[in-house]
Amino acid sequence: MPKLFFAFLLFTFCQLSAQSRKPLAGKEPSWITQTAIDYSNTSMDNDAEDGYADLDFEKQISLADQCVYIRKCVRIISEAGVQNESQVSVTFDPSFQQLTFHSIKIIRGGTAINQLQLSKIKTIQQENELDNFIYNGSLNAVLFLEDVRKGDIIEYSYSLKGFNPIFKGKYQDIYSLQYSSPLYQLYYKLIVPGGRTVNIKNTLDTIKPLVQTQPGATVYEWKRNNIKALHTQDYLPSWYEVFPDVMISEYNNWKEVNDWALSLFPKNINLPGALQQKIKEIQTTNTTTESRVQAALRFVQDDIRYMGIEMGVHSHKPADPGKVFNQRFGDCKEKSYLLCCMLRAMGIEADPALINTDFKKSLHNWLPGPTDFNHMTVRIKIGNEYYWFDPTIAYQRGNIRDISYPDYQCGFVITDTTTSLTDIPFHEKGEVNTKEVFDIPDMYGQAKLTVTTTYSGSYADETRYDFKNSSNYEMLKNYKNFYAAYFEQITADSLVTADNDGTGIFTTKEYYSIDSLWSLDKGIKKASFTSFIVQSIIHKPKDQQRNMPFSLQFPAKYHEEIEINLPEEWNAKSSEENIHCSSFMLHSKFSSSYRQVLLDYDFENFKDHVMPDEAKDFFANLNKSNESQGYKLTYNEKKTSKPSASHTSKFIYILLGVLLLVISIVKISQGK
């Protein structure tokens, strides 16, 4: 219901904005450079994707006019292209941008057919981040082209006038130089008025701009033709930069970025009475600095729901902390700023920290600028120690020393003296411990399975979040479906949980009944077991011959113990295997005692990626253990000898052949 309500408010706002910022039709700006397109070049069409070839992309910017001119041109080469590229779509922010179309045409047989009719252009509210509770007010101007045919060329151009005033006139952008599909012609132009300078830095390319001096301006141009597609490999780390580009920034250093940020997140502000009362309540109830931090953090995480209205300047400017407190919602910057203000009012040093959740430590190679970031968290100092917290993660529990913080690697802490990025130490002490007990009373009836799992750190946060947002029925069904992949005749009996606020440990206990645990093969009963948890969370990239790194879940620390209680004594061989390389470790141990067989696994990733020069050694270490992981129990009723247990290479192949890329079985906590 809240989402529908705010969607309605946003819709109303956008309708009003759309009426005052409807797309216009007009002439091209006088300052652009006219470039010719070679429509006849088809040399790379065979490498094109989605049924169309990109003939031209150009972007020209006038900083003095705060205007961006765009031209695109594609050739439809198949019926799939007719489906995929028969519309013109432009996104703009009506709060500060005016969209003007200059030309929309279909070129067929050398004849241009005009398609620019404002009456047919629909302005649509399109909230792509709605599922993440982010509302930015952007509109989408869409024209559905009629009578598009194979072989047609679609060409259109438009301008967006107006920069986001939150940046106070300063410019920052990234110009891409290569894409996953071929591009015949690429052109960038930047006009910088006199008295202003830009910093330029290339990534993965050595292209240099053509620089010209004009009266009152400096003009930079980048041109490139016949750009081949850059094909990437699967499971790349988010921070790995694949595509070459040119970074542009008017910010000369991080101090200038800090000065900009300080104006948005001032330290000394007046807090409303209701918020002051809440702060006083926390101080009175909690007598130590640590407990006050814990109480304030829990309030902001759990009682201030995550939702952002990020239209216009509010893409970066937070709402007043008092307003956030009263309305009980805010996005990452608003929740972080509120927490900082509350802690500062208690005399605790707390500062907001800008983060890039995707590129992380790669920011060290970027030009300084406020658009380098997509998230905000908090750094707190108690005594001589720093603590990092993410207020957008709900339901974190435990002592502040044990509360997990994502592996963001580096950030920009907004203080009076900040002049550089700050490296963030890795802080994750959590792990998952699972014990699966199979009670098999006889060789014919029903077996019982009891699964006890303790989660700590971020694993506890994620599991706690799932239980808070799903019914016990849904969780039990999901857990049962997990084991049903191994045991078809399994039924779920019950699921109970325990949550320790003091330690932050979350415990689940699952109870199952399994019919037909044993399969019959030529008079011999068989039952197979493997590391169910580790096997399920690990996946293998398709591209094993790597020239790019591949990602691993990090952190990832799991211990799994399988206890099999049997109706009679069993012959079983004990064994132990240790695998260790620069990226991960796996320890597996098998032992037996009278009527019991024990399987024990420890798995941990040491980092979030494997570099290409490490891949060969990585796979070699996996292959060493392909005969020691899985266990098969066999029982021959016709023989008098004891039943036996043995390793099964099939299961180790399944397990270790996929010991690479980990996908969490629980949803990570909310947050931008």
Specify the residue positions occupied by each region the protein language model found.
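A sensor for short, sequence-defined functional sites
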Residues: 19-662
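Sec/Tat signal peptide C-region and signal peptidase I cleavage site
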Residues: 14-18
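A periodicity- and composition-biased signal for non-globular, repetitive helical segments
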Residues: 8-9, 298, 666
